[in-house]
Amino acid sequence: MRMLPGRLMLLAALGSLPAPAAAVNLVPNGNFESNTGCPTSFSQLSVAVPWIAPTAGTSDYLNACAPNVFPSVNVPQNEQGYEPALSGSGYAGIIPRSAAADYREYIEAPLSAPLVANTPYLVRFNVSLADDSNLAIDRLGAYLSVGPVGPVPNYVALPYTPQVESPANTFLTNANGWTLVSATIVASGGEDHIVIGNFHDDANTATVAGPGQWPGGAYYYVDDVSVEVATPTDQACCLPNGSCAVMLPGECKLAGGAPGGPGSTCTPSPCGPTKLRKSSWGTVKTMYR
């Protein structure tokens, strides 16, 4: 039997693999469109099942379906300002920095499946500062927990370090549109809830003046929350001959190599001085994707 050259064997193996599945959002009702009833006042986050307020803070649900007699929680115009939903007709609302000392509001939801250890996930949520806010803050984050964090019988800052957080001293001042907060994390394993809010007390929360005159502090809308398995990206591959190539992790393993991990490159080389030409893998790369 005639032996296939190495590259053709690799192409044949890749061709037999199933196509990668589309990313699945593990956050149920991440766009806040499903509800058990239209909101009629503030503090009704729980109608956007399965979202809850995990502490004594009174987080809100706003939706365009709110009756006209309850305009305070309507969309796009509501008591805190004007902002169309990023998608659909609903979103959540929280106070992450208040005129009341160390008062915090959070939103929490269970994931549809626990995160798998050592797997990269892309975590995203979007925020918009309400027009009437007299303050804006710099850090809003998402904490992925094992089990729920609530119920907590007070409303102070939760004592957790969020895996995803907007940068310190980069203030979330956009009140005319939405700001994406996102990062790729590597799961420890078992995380099955997501909590969004400000995880810092007043002393460690930087503020600037907001666009409005509401004396209550900073109010933010939250929409389109997602946690998805991260799409594989090129990384360093340590091949059996000790050389380094940049390729997808699936290509690397089929070539008998060891992936260097997300973000790794061949400069400086992690495994050898000789770098294979990336272009030689172009056909494989196209087929794998």
Model-derived features: positions:
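Bacterial N-terminal signal peptides that target proteins for export
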Residues: 1-10
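Aromatic (Trp/Tyr/Phe) and Gly/Pro-enriched flexible surface segments
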Residues: 22-117, 126-130, 135-145, 152-232
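Extracellular/cell-surface secretome signature
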Residues: 233-273
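Terminal processing/anchoring signals of secreted or surface-associated proteins
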Residues: 281-284
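Short, solvent-exposed mixed-charge patches
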Residues: 288-289
